[in-house]
């Protein structure tokens, strides 16, 4: 059975953590992501410069947030800036398997092997290896792939996982974030630069 094609729509926007501050309280009130998006678009709550860009951003935001459980959405509402970034990183990894695979197979693997440098060429090599079995990667234009790579590394920096000089930074997960990530099977801690024993300490 062939693998489900990678979604490749994360060409801009970063983590959308600031935008999540707007959307999640609305969801707590209405409990319907379609209504959340409609309210955001109707009142331009994301303060987009154009209607079309606002709609694109709200669609992307809702698609990512909809991967979170009710408890996780409530956590985002009450989160610190760091916690919100971590939850939005988890949401991006869930929404986009390519991001999740890169996080687990490249970033976390490098971190665990004490190889602390993560650079754009690592993403290029990762994509080339996946393209052997993924036709959608083989057919993606160089321009689109550059946009994907640029936005992925923007997300990594916004989440605090990669420094400006390309070094992987250990993720200091809070207790409650570690708890919700570890509650999934398999654990979503696999998407973070943290060793399991550290995550276990945070979860207690």
Q: What do these predicted regions represent?
A:
Residues 12-16, 31-33, 94-100, 126-130:
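Helix-boundary capping/turn motifs
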Residues 29-31, 115-118:
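Short capping segments at the starts of secondary-structure elements
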Residues 119-135:
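DNA-recognition alpha helix
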Residues 87-90, 94-117:
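Positively charged, polyanion-binding regions of nucleic-acid-associated proteins
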Residues 20, 99-100, 120, 149:
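Short, leucine-enriched amphipathic alpha-helices that occur as contiguous helical runs
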Residues 138-204:
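Accessory, usually C-terminal, subdomains that scaffold auxiliary metal cofactors
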Residues 9, 17, 26, 97-98, ...:
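Leucine-rich, amphipathic alpha-helical/linker segments
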Residues 1-86:
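Eukaryotic partner-binding/assembly regions in large regulatory complexes
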């Amino acid at each position: 059975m062939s693998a489900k094609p990678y979604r490749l729509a994360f060409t801009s926007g970063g983590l959308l953590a600031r935008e999540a501050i707007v959307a999640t309280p609305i969801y707590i009130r209405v409990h319907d992501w379609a209504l959340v998006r409609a309210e955001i678009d109707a009142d331009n709550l994301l303060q987009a410069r154009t209607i079309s860009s606002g709609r694109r951003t709200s669609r992307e935001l809702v698609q990512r947030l909809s991967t979170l459980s009710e408890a996780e959405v409530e956590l985002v509402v009450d989160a610190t800036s760091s916690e919100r970034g971590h939850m939005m990183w988890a949401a991006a990894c869930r929404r986009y398997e390519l991001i999740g695979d890169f996080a687990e197979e490249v970033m976390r693997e490098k971190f665990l092997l004490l190889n602390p440098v993560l650079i754009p060429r690592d993403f290029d090599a990762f994509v080339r290896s996946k393209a052997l079995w993924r036709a959608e990667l083989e057919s993606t234009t160089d321009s689109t792939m550059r946009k994907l790579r640029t936005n992925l590394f923007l997300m990594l920096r916004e989440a605090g996982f990669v420094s400006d000089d390309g070094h992987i930074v250990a993720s200091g997960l809070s207790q409650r974030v570690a708890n919700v990530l570890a509650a999934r099977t398999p654990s979503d801690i696999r998407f973070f630069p943290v060793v399991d024993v550290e995550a276990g300490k945070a979860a207690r």
